[in-house]
């Protein structure tokens, strides 16, 4: 259970403006600086980075754009609507600075990601980090290790 459940976050942001997207529309573009924080109200989006599909998000209350906002850098992934999608949208810097409920939710989400990366790192080191593993795998493991230690992402 999260400190701020997605359903509670949805109730909290219901006064934010909404934006509707058609299938195929880009919500977040890698390399761009939108300055926006999006909260999925309904629909389904696909996330990819550098042409690699990372997954599909269809959970109402999912947050998009938080990493770019927190790190003050361009988005690192593309997010595209896979179905008709509606998101709440707000200025990321303002919300993260002034709204403790949203900031706490983002912190929990990021902590969960670091936890998953840590588990993945341990599993990679157990299975593929020893003798006989390719140099590329070893480099990827080290990059992931640095990301976990620094609290960031690879």
Q: Which role does the model predict for each range below?
A:
Residues 1-25, 98, 102:
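Cyclic nucleotide-binding regulatory module and flanking cytosolic helices
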Residues 13-14, 31-34, 51:
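Short, small/polar residue-rich loop motifs at catalytic or cofactor-binding pockets
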Residues 14, 56-115:
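Cyclic-nucleotide recognition modules
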Residues 17-32, 57-60:
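Conserved short histidine dyad/triad with adjacent acidic residue
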Residues 24, 35-51, 60-62:
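Glycine- and acidic-residue-biased ligand/ion/polar-headgroup-sensing regions
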Residues 82, 108-154:
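Polybasic "coupling" helices that flank or enter modular domains
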């Amino acid at each position: 259970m999260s400190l701020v459940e997605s359903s509670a976050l949805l109730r909290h942001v219901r006064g934010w403006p909404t934006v509707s997207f058609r299938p195929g529309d880009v919500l977040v573009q890698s390399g761009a600086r939108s300055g926006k924080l999006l909260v999925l109200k309904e629909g389904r989006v696909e996330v990819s980075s550098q042409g690699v599909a990372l997954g599909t998000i269809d959970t109402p209350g999912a947050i998009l754009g938080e990493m770019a906002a927190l790190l003050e850098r361009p988005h690192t992934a593309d997010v595209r609507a896979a179905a008709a999608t509606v998101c709440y949208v707000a200025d990321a810097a303002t919300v993260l600075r002034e709204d403790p409920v949203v900031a706490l939710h983002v912190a929990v989400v990021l902590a969960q990601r670091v936890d998953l990366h840590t588990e993945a790192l341990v599993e990679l080191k157990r299975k593929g980090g020893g003798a006989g593993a390719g140099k590329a795998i070893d480099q990827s493991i080290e990059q992931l290790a640095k990301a976990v230690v620094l609290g960031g992402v690879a």
